[in-house]
Regions:
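Processing junctions and N-termini across compartments
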Residues: 14, 27-30, 75
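Sequence/structural segment immediately N-terminal to covalent heme-attachment motifs in c-type
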Residues: 21-39
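Bacterial N-terminal signal peptides that target proteins for export
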Residues: 1-8
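Gly/Gly-Pro-rich "capping" loops immediately C-terminal to redox-active cysteine motifs
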Residues: 26, 38-66
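Axial heme c-ligation environment in periplasmic c-type cytochrome domains
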Residues: 44-52, 67-109
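Hydrophobic alpha-helical targeting segments used for export or membrane insertion
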Residues: 9-13
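N-terminal signal peptide c-region/cleavage motif recognized by signal peptidases
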Residues: 15-20
Length: 109
């Protein structure tokens, strides 16, 4: 096989590997969040819809990583949310944040 035929094949292979490694925010939700949060209604913790409508991406990520350091700044009296600093990769953190923000009301987008 000539080099001109190999290059497109290699590029296709690399792009498919990259696509396969994309982190799914809904999977992160089911793995870590669903026990306390629901997408649109209050469970033990606030709904993703409420969070998305009240918080910035930075506030959401900060609270996921260090809830004990951020809860007062966010107007809460206490937080029982565990830290996910050592549990989530940056890709997982970005994916769950994007998933949460997908519940933001259309009028607020």
């Amino acid at each position: 096989m000539s080099i001109t035929r190999k290059i497109p094949l290699v590029l296709m292979l690399l792009s498919s590997l990259s696509f396969a490694q994309e982190v799914n925010g809904e999977k992160v939700f089911t793995d870590y969040c669903w026990g306390c949060h629901h997408q649109t209604s209050v469970a033990f913790g606030p709904s993703f819809q409420e969070i998305a409508n009240k918080r910035t991406i930075g506030e959401i990520q900060g609270h996921i990583i260090a809830p004990k350091s951020t809860y007062k700044q966010l107007g809460h009296k206490r937080s029982v949310m565990p830290s996910f600093k050592d549990k989530l990769s940056q890709d997982e953190l970005n994916a769950i944040t994007k998933f949460i923000m997908s519940y933001k009301s259309k009028k607020d987008k």
